[in-house]
C-alpha cells in the first residue's frame, strides 16, 4: 500500500463517529482473545496432565524469541513513519515492523490450538487472519509485514508440531 491508500483508509475510519473507537476495540479484542485463550489452553493442558504442553510452550516460546530477534535486526520502518500519517492505533515505534509480531504470535498460537483441537485451531486461524487485516487497516503494518508474520507463524507451527 502507498501513502495515499493509508491516508484514505485512516481518514475514512476517522470520519465515522465511532470509527476510531471501534477500530481500537477490534485491535484490543482480537489481541486479547488470542492471548487469553492461549493462557487458558495452557491451564487446560496442565489440568489434563497433557504432556504435549511442553511442545506447545517450547515451540511458541522459541519461535517468538527468534521472530523478535529477526525483526530487531531488520528494523523495518512502519507505514506511518514512512508516509507521515497518524495511525489509528497509538504507536510511537519507528521500526520493528517486519515481521508483524502480533500476527506471527496469533498464527503460531492458532497452530498450537490446531495441534490440540482442530476446530479451535481453525477458529483461531480465522482470528489471526482478521488480526492481520486489521493491523494493516489501522496503519501500523504494511501488508508484507503481516504476510511474513503469518507465514513464519504457520511454518513454525508446522515444523514444531507436525515435523519435529
Q: Would you name each region that the model predicts?
A:
Residues 1-36, 51, 67-95:
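N-terminal transmembrane-helix/juxtamembrane module of multi-pass inner/ER membrane proteins
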Residues 18, 43-49, 116, 161-163:
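Structural signal for the C-terminal ends of transmembrane alpha-helices
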Residues 30-42, 123-126:
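Hydrophobic alpha-helical transmembrane segments
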Residues 40-66:
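Interfacial segments of alpha-helical transmembrane regions
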Residues 47, 75-80, 139-144:
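Transmembrane helix-loop junctions in multipass membrane proteins, especially transporters and channels
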Residues 58-71, 122-134:
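Small-polar-interrupted transmembrane alpha-helices in polytopic inner-membrane proteins
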Residues 64-68, 72, 154-161:
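Transmembrane alpha-helical segments of multi-pass membrane transport proteins and ion-pumping complexes
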Residues 84-164:
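Membrane-embedded catalytic cores of phosphoryl/pyrophosphoryl-handling enzymes
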